[in-house]
Amino acid sequence: MRHPASRLTLLASTVAFALAAQAAPSAADRIAGTELIARDALFGNPERANVQMSPDGKYLSWVAAVDGVLNVWVAPADNPAQAKAVTQDKARGIRSYFWSYQPDTLLYLRDSGGDEDFHLYAVDLKTGQAKDLTPFPKTTAQVAGLSPKHPGTILVGMNDRDAQWHDVYKVDLASGTRTLLEKNDAQIAGYIADADYTLKYAQRSRPDGGADVLRRGANGAWEKFDDIPFEDVLTTSPGGLTLDRRTLYFTDSRGRNTAALFAIDVASGKRTLVLEDARADVGGTLADPATGKVQAVSVDYLRDEWKVVDPAIRADLQKLEAIGPGDVSVNTRTLDDKTWIVAYSAAEAPLVYYRYDRPAGTLTKLFSARPKLEGKPLVPQWPVEIASRDNKTLVSYLTLPRSADADSDGKAEAPVPLVLLVHGGPWARDSYGYGSYNQWLANRGYAVLSVNFRGSTGFGKAFTNAGNGEWAGKMHDDLLDAVQWAVKQGVTTQDQVAIMGGSYGGYATLAGLTFTPDAFACGVDIVGPSNLNTLLSTVPPYWASFFEQLAKRMGDPRTDAGKKWLTERSPLTRADQIKKPLLIGQGANDPRVKQAESDQIVKAMQARNIPVTYVLFPDEGHGFARPENNKAFNAVTEGFLAQCLGGRAEPIGKDFTGSSISVPVGADGVPGLAEALKGHTQEVKK
């Protein structure tokens, strides 16, 4: 017979547990006191973005919407209020544009439906006419050179003759006439031209994954100039020539770990170190627009820092850095170097653009990219260094919701659900700065952790090369180690972590739910590959120069051993292990990760009666460029995560309006999705 005291203790414990469970607030409850930021403010069209100035200082330009579609606007430099749209895109929108040195002429790139077959267009501001300079089907234009000495022409690489390799043409901006400069029969990956459009240097990939740097010989033939071993090929490359052709800049990690910038005297071959940093590779540069001489170099370890190498601009950069505690970048400098267009961003503030009058030393605020976010409860981002299980340092970025960090000190006061947001590439990196996804997720009640796992770039070649052969291996271990760090720091608990990402981040999501099926509460895969064999067998043809690197870093699909390895590391192989909710987003025109990658794993899950929600956009590619589609997918994601992690969710409402969203499978898996689709009229715009 049980002792009465034991029975009483058991009853008291049960009641206490029930009361505790009932009292535990959800992530949505805890964030309820913070104003909800509308998805439209975060993911709709920016009011103004990509602000530039023409080289002659005559015009100010930016990208802004016309009837909901992004186009290029131009205004007199001294009167932005007189701006007018100079492009008339009515479908996908224009995001990438730049000025030529020809007065009154700008250029822009546009593809169709995300297929990445980019055409190059020239716009004559006097006539308002746009001309397609690359009017060839299935051709991807690559801008190879612009020169103030030849303002009426531009160098363009085109692969219309051979889909794998780009020939180089000089193109007349007014007529569109192209003149062949180099028929690429030598399988050249890229060229460097001087200011007179003479091709001086080139780079060619080798079967061992390394590369040869070539120089034009006296007889006009290419001859070997330098050798880049495979282990250095992602961190070593020739940069550009100064306008006087006397100096070649070269980023180089050979004989060292982090990539440094060198200046090579073309006549003597003497190499001079310009800048190095033991923590991180050198990044962007600021060059004198009249000479091409490098004046400052950026290094991004925890934060992006500008290192001055020419004292002539030291005072200028000090003035820019005084804008605030965030990061600054220089978008454009006029040819006379009197005016700079500067972008300033902090994690808790979207981009703000300034005009810098260099002779006067004064800054004038121009525009905020997203003024709708001014005064909204945006939160800081905290750079952190996380130790992996084998003692590698994983530079990462933590964003905490106000419900977990009321005093904004970067230390969690109580655990909240966490979204592990994995970057794509994987040969890329996460950096400090404003991120719409980080702010969105934090505003819904989640902590967000972005991790630079091994294989990421920017931290030296050893860290990048440590990812070779480690898809679903040590690269994934790094993500798991980062989650454990967050648990130990009190940011979250083991049972309330979601994984989410695009491209490689989508693969990491699928790997997380298949290779480690108990590690995550749910996953959001955006254009992620599920089958590494089919991924590598369907890459775009113009990736030929990069393919040997892919084979060495991932696995070689041309060999039996490589196929076996790739099969073992493919989430599709382990689809039967999925037991947590999965949301998949895919663009039907993706040239990198084909729609079949998502189709395959969805079909495998259906065959095993495993639930999945599959969202497909017929007018998108590798990611969702149209704001209508991006908002639509994020509306679905928000409901999905709220169901999984308990954060708050703004109703789908009208966020499908104008989008091409379709849900072939699993519309009933996300609250409100099936109902929202019933009244939706699909709008496909390529």
Predicted feature residues:
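Gram-negative bacterial Sec-dependent N-terminal signal peptides
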Residues: 2-22
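Bacterial Sec-dependent signal peptides at the C-terminal "C-region" and cleavage site
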Residues: 19-32
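Mature N-terminal segment immediately following signal peptide/propeptide cleavage
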Residues: 30-67, 71-72
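Conserved beta-strand positions that form and line the central face of beta-propeller blades
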Residues: 41, 82-86, 132, 180, ...
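Peripheral, non-catalytic segments that deliver or gate enzyme domains
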Residues: 45-49, 67-72, 89-95, 100-395, ...
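Beta-propeller domains
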Residues: 62-88
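Cap/lid segment of the alpha/beta-hydrolase catalytic domain
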Residues: 372-498, 502-503, 508, 530, ...
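Active-site-proximal cap/loop segments of hydrolase catalytic domains
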Residues: 453-686
